[in-house]
Amino acid sequence: MDETATSSEVTETFVSDPTTRQFEEDGHPPLETRHLNMIHEELEKLNISTDVINKMEVQLDLARADFRETQVQWSEKLKELSKQYSSQIAKARPFYELKIKERSLREESQKAAERFERATSILGIAKQQVSLTQESLSRQTSVLPECLEVLNHHIQRVREVEEERTAAESLHASKAHAMLHLAEKIRAMEKDNRYAIKKSRLYFEKRLEFTKILEAQKATILCLEAEVRQKKNDYTTSLRNLERISERIHEERSTGSLESAVSSDQEDQKSDFKSSESLPGNPPPYAPTAPPPYEDKYIIDKDDDSIVLNMIKTEQEEEGEKRNSRSLGSGVILLAQQLIGNGNSTEKHNITPPRHGEEADISYHTRPVGLSDGSDNSEVSSLASFNIGDDDTVSKMLMSHSELIKDIELATDRVGHILKPNIKSVSNAHE
């Protein structure tokens, strides 16, 4: 107990003193958090075990002192009674010994009776199982070996329970016979020593009370001793855990010193490599980036469904008819302009004036409102870039209003003759 108290004081001072946690005096780095947590946990267990051991040992000492005091007090009382009734106690002692023996026989007989009753109930259940199994086998046309095995198991169980029942019955009978024989002896002794038994009754009653008190105190002492033994085992386990943690810390530090030396060499190599990489060098060569390839989002693959292609074709034909009917007048005018341009192309090729800056490329587009750019020559007329020179050149290119109207009428007639067969083919296709 003193050693445990001193160890508890040492552990408490270790926990309370923060300077002992620092390892700077030995030249070691501070402990990691997980190691500190493990050490703190084991030290808490040590402190708790020490407190419990100290309290239980105090209780154990008190219980032992009470046991000794009770034993001394009752021994003195029994000695006084034995001196007072010495002759009567000597005559009545065999009677009370037989009474104690009778009590033990009664308890054994009670246990044998309970065993017999239990075996009887189990035997009834086993016999019922055997009868049910036999009935089920009698209803079957072909008896399976598994069913026979179950029946044999139930029969074997019945035999075992019958043997248990017979043994319990014989034991109960023997205990009952012994009790009857002992009861006859007790009656005979009580008849012969009635006066001595009556005088010494106080002594034996006090002795029985004294025995009960001592047995209770003895049970308390044994319980406290078992608890103290368990807590001491916990204390030694915590000490061993602390030793393991200390060994682990030393191993990690020894391996960590080697790893730190290797890592320092690697870091030096990396720093040298980074310093060599940090030197300025020539810029990378120029790599021109090409524009992204043209992607036609409206191209239809050949593997597409033929139904979709037919629908698109019919829609395109309907839109073509609408455009032809809607832009007939505008198309006539554009064709007339093209014819006029073709008629004057000879004169344009002969004239090659110099080009000037922004006026060198001029295109004229005349298309109906709402139509998009496409490959249809009837809707878009792109005049070649006119080279504008002096006033004489401009005057040759211009025409009077009346001549332009006549040319437009002639172009209209030509377009009418050209479009008639196309319109007929379209109508036949719709039909």
Curated annotation (Swiss-Prot):
Sequence segments annotated as region (Disordered): 1-28, 249-298
InterPro entries xrefs: SH3BP5 (IPR007940)
Biased composition (Polar residues): 1-21, 255-264
Swiss-Prot/TrEMBL keywords: Cell cycle, Cell division, Coiled coil, GTP-binding, Nucleotide-binding
Coiled coil: 149-171, 214-247
GO CC terms of this entry: cytoplasm
GO biological process, one term: cell division
Residue ranges with Pro residues bias: 281-293
Phenotype seen when the gene is deleted: Viable. Double knockout with rei-1 results in a smaller brood size, weak embryonic lethality and severe mislocalization of rab-11.1 and prolonged cytokinesis in embryos.
Transmembrane residue ranges: none
GO molecular function term, any single one: protein kinase inhibitor activity
Known role: Guanine nucleotide exchange factor for Rab GTPase Rab-11.1. May spatially and temporally regulate the distribution of Rab-11.1 to target membranes during embryogenesis. May play a role in cytokinesis, probably by targeting rab-11.1 to the cleavage furrows.
Subunit and interaction comment: Interacts with rab-11.1. Binds preferentially to the GDP-bound form of rab-11.1.
PANTHER family for this protein: SH3 DOMAIN-BINDING PROTEIN 5
Family per similarity comment: Belongs to the SH3BP5 family.
Protein name: Guanine nucleotide exchange factor rei-2
Gene: rei-2
